[in-house]
């Protein structure tokens, strides 16, 4: 975590949420499948629901936000590159993004 010292607080929190989600994703998906399966007994389904509720709050997929990996900005982020508008423009003009060229017609 020491190498991530340049990140702003919200970007750092988002990174932690992404890691937590990755750790608990399989467990969450399997318990959701059990909980949503109407053919299983009600007791088994309710136990699966309790296991889902016992997972950390930050491990939920809705906690993951689309933030710039350089600046931590939450708006104007290109999903394919994970960069906000201005860092994207700077890297594109410096030819540091593969496959991106300035348009000319």
From Swiss-Prot:
MF-aspect GO terms: structural constituent of ribosome
Coiled-coil portions: none
Superkingdom classification of source: Eukaryota
GO cellular component: mitochondrial small ribosomal subunit; mitochondrion
Family of this protein: Belongs to the universal ribosomal protein uS14 family.
Function comment: Component of the mitochondrial ribosome (mitoribosome), a dedicated translation machinery responsible for the synthesis of mitochondrial genome-encoded proteins, including at least some of the essential transmembrane subunits of the mitochondrial respiratory chain. The mitoribosomes are attached to the mitochondrial inner membrane and translation products are cotranslationally integrated into the membrane.
Protein name as it appears in the record: Small ribosomal subunit protein uS14m
Naturally occurring in which organism (per UniProt): Schizosaccharomyces pombe (strain 972 / ATCC 24843)
Gene name of this polypeptide: mrp2
